[in-house]
Protein backbone atom coordinates (compact mmCIF):
# COMPACT_ATOMS: atom_id res chain seq x y z
CA UNK A 1 0.00 0.00 0.00
CA UNK A 2 1.72 3.16 -1.24
CA UNK A 3 -0.72 5.96 -0.37
CA UNK A 4 -2.86 6.93 2.60
CA UNK A 5 -2.99 8.23 6.16
CA UNK A 6 -1.82 6.83 9.49
CA UNK A 7 -2.93 8.02 12.93
CA UNK A 8 0.18 7.73 15.06
CA UNK A 9 0.23 7.98 18.86
CA UNK A 10 3.31 10.17 19.23
CA UNK A 11 5.29 9.13 22.30
CA UNK A 12 6.66 11.48 24.94
CA UNK A 13 10.10 12.99 24.33
CA UNK A 14 10.12 12.40 20.57
CA UNK A 15 9.80 15.19 18.00
CA UNK A 16 7.25 15.07 15.18
CA UNK A 17 10.14 15.24 12.72
CA UNK A 18 11.73 12.19 14.31
CA UNK A 19 8.48 10.24 13.87
CA UNK A 20 8.41 11.23 10.19
CA UNK A 21 12.02 10.08 9.81
CA UNK A 22 11.28 6.68 11.35
CA UNK A 23 8.27 6.18 9.10
CA UNK A 24 10.22 7.12 5.98
CA UNK A 25 12.62 4.28 6.74
CA UNK A 26 9.81 1.92 7.65
CA UNK A 27 7.58 2.64 4.63
CA UNK A 28 10.27 3.55 2.08
CA UNK A 29 8.25 6.41 0.59
CA UNK A 30 7.48 10.10 0.96
CA UNK A 31 6.03 10.95 4.39
CA UNK A 32 4.64 14.11 6.00
CA UNK A 33 2.66 15.07 9.10
CA UNK A 34 -0.35 17.32 9.68
CA UNK A 35 0.41 19.53 12.67
CA UNK A 36 3.56 19.53 14.79
CA UNK A 37 3.48 18.28 18.37
CA UNK A 38 6.13 19.43 20.84
CA UNK A 39 8.45 16.65 22.10
CA UNK A 40 6.79 16.72 25.55
CA UNK A 41 3.33 16.28 23.99
CA UNK A 42 1.80 12.91 23.17
CA UNK A 43 -1.16 11.73 21.15
CA UNK A 44 -2.70 12.10 17.73
CA UNK A 45 -0.17 12.82 14.97
CA UNK A 46 -1.73 12.29 11.52
CA UNK A 47 0.86 11.01 9.06
CA UNK A 48 0.39 11.14 5.29
CA UNK A 49 2.44 8.93 2.98
CA UNK A 50 2.76 8.65 -0.77
CA UNK A 51 0.28 10.74 -2.73
CA UNK A 52 -1.61 11.58 0.48
CA UNK A 53 1.19 14.06 1.28
CA UNK A 54 -0.52 16.35 -1.24
CA UNK A 55 -3.49 16.65 1.14
CA UNK A 56 -1.80 17.52 4.46
CA UNK A 57 -3.12 21.09 4.52
CA UNK A 58 -6.70 19.76 4.59
CA UNK A 59 -5.94 17.89 7.82
CA UNK A 60 -4.00 20.82 9.30
CA UNK A 61 -7.00 23.11 8.80
CA UNK A 62 -9.42 20.89 10.78
CA UNK A 63 -10.47 21.23 14.42
CA UNK A 64 -8.11 19.82 17.04
CA UNK A 65 -8.64 18.79 20.66
CA UNK A 66 -6.12 18.68 23.49
CA UNK A 67 -6.10 17.61 27.12
CA UNK A 68 -3.65 19.67 29.14
CA UNK A 69 -2.50 19.78 32.74
CA UNK A 70 -1.53 23.28 33.89
CA UNK A 71 0.80 23.70 36.86
CA UNK A 72 0.10 26.88 38.83
CA UNK A 73 2.57 29.08 40.70
CA UNK A 74 5.36 29.48 38.17
CA UNK A 75 5.93 31.03 34.76
CA UNK A 76 8.65 29.40 32.65
CA UNK A 77 10.45 30.79 29.61
CA UNK A 78 9.27 27.90 27.39
CA UNK A 79 5.73 27.95 28.87
CA UNK A 80 6.15 24.24 29.69
CA UNK A 81 7.87 22.16 32.37
CA UNK A 82 11.16 21.98 30.47
CA UNK A 83 11.86 25.71 30.77
CA UNK A 84 13.57 27.94 33.31
CA UNK A 85 11.50 29.55 36.06
CA UNK A 86 11.20 33.29 35.38
CA UNK A 87 8.37 34.29 37.78
CA UNK A 88 6.67 32.77 40.81
CA UNK A 89 3.50 33.39 42.79
CA UNK A 90 2.03 32.10 46.04
CA UNK A 91 -1.52 32.72 44.81
CA UNK A 92 -3.60 29.71 43.77
CA UNK A 93 -6.81 29.88 41.71
CA UNK A 94 -10.12 28.45 42.84
CA UNK A 95 -12.27 26.28 40.62
CA UNK A 96 -14.75 29.16 40.32
CA UNK A 97 -12.09 31.69 39.30
CA UNK A 98 -10.69 29.31 36.67
CA UNK A 99 -14.13 28.76 35.14
CA UNK A 100 -14.77 32.50 35.02
CA UNK A 101 -11.38 33.24 33.44
CA UNK A 102 -11.81 30.55 30.79
CA UNK A 103 -14.73 32.45 29.28
CA UNK A 104 -12.26 35.06 28.00
CA UNK A 105 -10.52 32.44 25.88
CA UNK A 106 -13.47 31.10 23.89
CA UNK A 107 -14.04 32.41 20.37
CA UNK A 108 -11.68 34.45 18.21
CA UNK A 109 -8.89 35.78 20.41
CA UNK A 110 -5.53 37.51 19.99
CA UNK A 111 -2.70 35.22 21.03
CA UNK A 112 1.06 35.82 21.18
CA UNK A 113 2.79 32.48 20.43
CA UNK A 114 5.45 31.13 22.75
CA UNK A 115 8.93 32.49 22.05
CA UNK A 116 10.03 28.85 22.06
CA UNK A 117 7.94 28.06 18.98
CA UNK A 118 8.82 27.08 15.41
CA UNK A 119 7.70 30.44 13.99
CA UNK A 120 10.39 31.99 11.81
CA UNK A 121 11.83 35.39 12.74
CA UNK A 122 14.25 36.81 10.21
CA UNK A 123 14.78 33.39 8.67
CA UNK A 124 15.44 31.61 11.99
CA UNK A 125 13.11 29.63 14.24
CA UNK A 126 11.98 31.54 17.32
CA UNK A 127 13.11 28.72 19.61
CA UNK A 128 16.62 28.84 18.11
CA UNK A 129 16.90 32.57 18.80
CA UNK A 130 15.52 32.13 22.32
CA UNK A 131 18.02 29.36 23.10
CA UNK A 132 20.80 31.70 21.93
CA UNK A 133 19.65 34.19 24.55
CA UNK A 134 18.31 36.67 22.02
CA UNK A 135 15.11 38.60 22.67
CA UNK A 136 12.24 37.44 20.47
CA UNK A 137 9.21 39.65 19.85
CA UNK A 138 6.29 37.87 18.20
CA UNK A 139 3.18 39.69 17.02
CA UNK A 140 -0.28 38.69 18.28
CA UNK A 141 -2.27 36.41 15.99
CA UNK A 142 -6.00 35.90 15.58
CA UNK A 143 -6.87 32.31 16.50
CA UNK A 144 -10.13 30.54 17.31
CA UNK A 145 -10.85 28.40 20.35
CA UNK A 146 -14.25 26.75 20.03
CA UNK A 147 -14.46 25.20 23.49
CA UNK A 148 -12.54 25.01 26.78
CA UNK A 149 -13.74 22.63 29.48
CA UNK A 150 -12.35 22.46 33.00
CA UNK A 151 -12.03 18.73 33.71
CA UNK A 152 -10.60 18.79 37.22
CA UNK A 153 -8.77 20.85 39.84
CA UNK A 154 -6.22 19.33 42.23
CA UNK A 155 -5.44 21.64 45.14
CA UNK A 156 -2.85 19.20 46.46
CA UNK A 157 -0.63 19.38 43.38
CA UNK A 158 -1.80 22.90 42.41
CA UNK A 159 -2.85 21.78 38.93
CA UNK A 160 -5.89 21.91 36.68
CA UNK A 161 -6.84 19.67 33.77
CA UNK A 162 -8.49 21.25 30.72
CA UNK A 163 -9.87 20.05 27.42
CA UNK A 164 -9.36 22.54 24.58
CA UNK A 165 -10.92 22.31 21.12
CA UNK A 166 -9.56 24.82 18.66
CA UNK A 167 -8.71 25.73 15.09
CA UNK A 168 -5.39 26.09 13.32
CA UNK A 169 -2.56 28.08 14.88
CA UNK A 170 -3.49 27.86 18.58
CA UNK A 171 -0.56 27.35 20.98
CA UNK A 172 -1.78 25.49 24.06
CA UNK A 173 1.37 26.56 25.91
CA UNK A 174 0.38 30.18 25.27
CA UNK A 175 -3.11 29.46 26.63
CA UNK A 176 -1.57 28.11 29.85
CA UNK A 177 0.76 31.12 30.11
CA UNK A 178 -1.99 33.69 29.49
CA UNK A 179 -4.51 31.97 31.75
CA UNK A 180 -1.97 31.99 34.58
CA UNK A 181 -1.40 35.71 34.07
CA UNK A 182 -5.16 36.38 33.98
CA UNK A 183 -5.58 34.51 37.27
CA UNK A 184 -2.58 36.28 38.82
CA UNK A 185 -0.84 33.04 39.76
CA UNK A 186 1.19 32.15 36.64
CA UNK A 187 1.10 28.74 35.01
CA UNK A 188 2.77 26.41 32.52
CA UNK A 189 2.03 23.16 30.69
CA UNK A 190 2.96 20.14 32.78
CA UNK A 191 1.34 17.57 30.49
CA UNK A 192 -0.17 17.80 27.01
CA UNK A 193 -1.95 15.21 24.91
CA UNK A 194 -3.66 15.79 21.56
CA UNK A 195 -6.82 13.70 21.32
CA UNK A 196 -8.23 14.73 17.92
CA UNK A 197 -7.24 16.18 14.57
CA UNK A 198 -10.33 16.25 12.35
CA UNK A 199 -11.27 12.61 11.62
CA UNK A 200 -8.29 11.23 13.55
CA UNK A 201 -9.04 10.43 17.20
CA UNK A 202 -7.79 8.27 20.05
CA UNK A 203 -10.31 5.64 19.01
CA UNK A 204 -8.38 4.88 15.81
CA UNK A 205 -4.80 5.52 16.93
CA UNK A 206 -1.77 3.22 16.57
CA UNK A 207 1.63 3.27 18.29
CA UNK A 208 4.93 3.14 16.41
CA UNK A 209 5.59 -0.30 17.88
CA UNK A 210 2.21 -1.60 16.73
CA UNK A 211 2.78 -0.17 13.27
CA UNK A 212 6.22 -1.76 13.03
CA UNK A 213 4.64 -5.12 13.86
CA UNK A 214 1.97 -4.67 11.19
CA UNK A 215 4.60 -3.77 8.58
CA UNK A 216 6.64 -6.83 9.52
CA UNK A 217 3.56 -9.03 9.10
CA UNK A 218 2.57 -7.34 5.79
CA UNK A 219 -0.62 -6.05 7.43
CA UNK A 220 -0.04 -2.31 7.04
CA UNK A 221 -3.48 -1.87 5.46
CA UNK A 222 -5.07 -2.55 8.87
CA UNK A 223 -3.79 0.83 10.08
CA UNK A 224 -4.20 2.85 6.88
CA UNK A 225 -6.95 5.39 6.20
CA UNK A 226 -7.76 6.35 2.60
CA UNK A 227 -6.33 9.52 1.10
CA UNK A 228 -9.88 10.88 0.88
CA UNK A 229 -10.46 10.85 4.67
CA UNK A 230 -9.39 14.51 4.87
CA UNK A 231 -11.43 15.55 1.83
CA UNK A 232 -14.81 15.66 3.58
CA UNK A 233 -14.82 19.45 3.51
CA UNK A 234 -14.82 19.54 -0.31
CA UNK A 235 -17.66 18.66 -2.70
CA UNK A 236 -16.97 15.15 -4.02
CA UNK A 237 -17.58 14.45 -7.69
CA UNK A 238 -17.17 11.09 -9.43
CA UNK A 239 -15.93 10.99 -13.02
CA UNK A 240 -15.37 8.18 -15.50
CA UNK A 241 -12.03 6.63 -16.46
CA UNK A 242 -11.60 8.58 -19.70
CA UNK A 243 -12.32 11.91 -18.02
CA UNK A 244 -9.89 10.99 -15.25
CA UNK A 245 -7.15 10.59 -17.87
CA UNK A 246 -7.91 14.09 -19.16
CA UNK A 247 -7.69 15.58 -15.65
CA UNK A 248 -4.45 13.74 -14.86
CA UNK A 249 -2.93 15.31 -17.96
CA UNK A 250 -3.62 18.70 -16.39
CA UNK A 251 -6.56 19.69 -18.58
CA UNK A 252 -9.71 21.46 -17.39
CA UNK A 253 -13.12 19.78 -17.58
CA UNK A 254 -16.70 21.01 -17.57
CA UNK A 255 -18.35 19.42 -14.54
CA UNK A 256 -21.81 19.49 -16.09
CA UNK A 257 -20.51 17.15 -18.79
CA UNK A 258 -18.20 14.99 -16.68
CA UNK A 259 -19.88 14.25 -13.36
CA UNK A 260 -21.31 10.76 -12.84
CA UNK A 261 -23.10 11.41 -9.57
CA UNK A 262 -24.96 14.60 -10.46
CA UNK A 263 -23.03 16.82 -8.06
CA UNK A 264 -21.83 19.17 -10.75
CA UNK A 265 -23.51 22.27 -9.32
CA UNK A 266 -20.94 23.53 -6.82
CA UNK A 267 -22.45 26.50 -5.02
CA UNK A 268 -20.48 28.85 -2.78
CA UNK A 269 -17.37 26.73 -3.18
CA UNK A 270 -14.24 27.26 -5.22
CA UNK A 271 -12.69 23.80 -4.85
CA UNK A 272 -13.79 20.19 -5.38
CA UNK A 273 -12.41 16.66 -5.05
CA UNK A 274 -12.61 14.32 -8.04
CA UNK A 275 -12.48 10.54 -7.93
CA UNK A 276 -13.30 7.65 -10.20
CA UNK A 277 -16.14 5.28 -9.38
CA UNK A 278 -14.97 3.05 -6.56
CA UNK A 279 -13.21 5.88 -4.76
CA UNK A 280 -9.95 6.01 -6.73
CA UNK A 281 -8.54 9.53 -6.12
CA UNK A 282 -8.05 11.68 -9.22
CA UNK A 283 -7.47 15.32 -8.27
CA UNK A 284 -8.29 18.38 -6.22
CA UNK A 285 -9.59 21.08 -8.53
CA UNK A 286 -10.32 24.77 -8.50
CA UNK A 287 -13.88 25.45 -9.68
CA UNK A 288 -14.66 28.51 -11.80
CA UNK A 289 -18.01 28.90 -13.58
CA UNK A 290 -18.64 25.15 -13.65
CA UNK A 291 -15.16 24.31 -14.92
CA UNK A 292 -12.74 22.25 -12.83
CA UNK A 293 -9.05 23.13 -13.08
CA UNK A 294 -6.73 20.50 -11.53
CA UNK A 295 -4.37 21.92 -8.89
CA UNK A 296 -3.37 18.63 -7.19
CA UNK A 297 -3.32 15.47 -9.30
CA UNK A 298 -3.00 12.07 -7.59
CA UNK A 299 -0.81 9.52 -9.34
CA UNK A 300 -2.43 6.37 -7.98
UniProtKB/Swiss-Prot annotation:
A UniProt-annotated Pfam family: TruB_N
Top-level taxonomic group: Bacteria
GO annotation terms (biological process): mRNA pseudouridine synthesis; tRNA pseudouridine synthesis
EC number: 5.4.99.25
Ranges in a coiled coil: none
Enzyme kind, highest EC tier: isomerase
Role played: Responsible for synthesis of pseudouridine from uracil-55 in the psi GC loop of transfer RNAs.
Name of the protein this chain belongs to: tRNA pseudouridine synthase B
Entry's transmembrane regions: none
Family statement: Belongs to the pseudouridine synthase TruB family. Type 1 subfamily.
Source organism (scientific name): Anaplasma phagocytophilum (strain HZ)
Active site: 38
Reactions performed catalytically: uridine(55) in tRNA = pseudouridine(55) in tRNA
InterPro entries in UniProt: PsdUridine_synth_cat_dom_sf, PsdUridine_synth_N, tRNA_psdUridine_synth_TruB, TruB_C
Amino acid sequence: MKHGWLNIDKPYGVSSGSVVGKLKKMLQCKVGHAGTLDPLATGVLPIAFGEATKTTNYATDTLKSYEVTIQWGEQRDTDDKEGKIIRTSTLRPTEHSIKEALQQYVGVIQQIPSTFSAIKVGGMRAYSLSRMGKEVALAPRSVCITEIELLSVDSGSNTADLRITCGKGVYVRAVARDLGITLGCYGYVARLRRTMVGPFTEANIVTLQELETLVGENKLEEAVFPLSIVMSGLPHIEIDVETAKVVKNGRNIRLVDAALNGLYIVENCDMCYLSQAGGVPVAICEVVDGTAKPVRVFNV
